[in-house]
């Protein structure tokens, strides 16, 4: 991920990993039910958020510096950009594995799918 100048590399790695985990939850487990008035109908603990012991250890953050950018401190924000490609990549991998294209998230019939 291009960050311009890596001011705090450890923090950047944490942001990348956090964005990936957030998007994994969106793709695989998280459901945020609301009523017709947009009021949440589930308690926080029932939303399907990943717990720390459920996060795969294989997330590898690769920080790419691009010095000389004409921005404040030479740094570029990294927060949300890391979460954008993950859910579509997981959905495509699921399609390649099963041959079934799904159009709703979280994906169904996966080991992570919410239990009924």
Walk through the language-model features, giving the residues of each.
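C-terminal catalytic domains of large/alpha subunits in multi-subunit enzymes
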Residues: 1-116
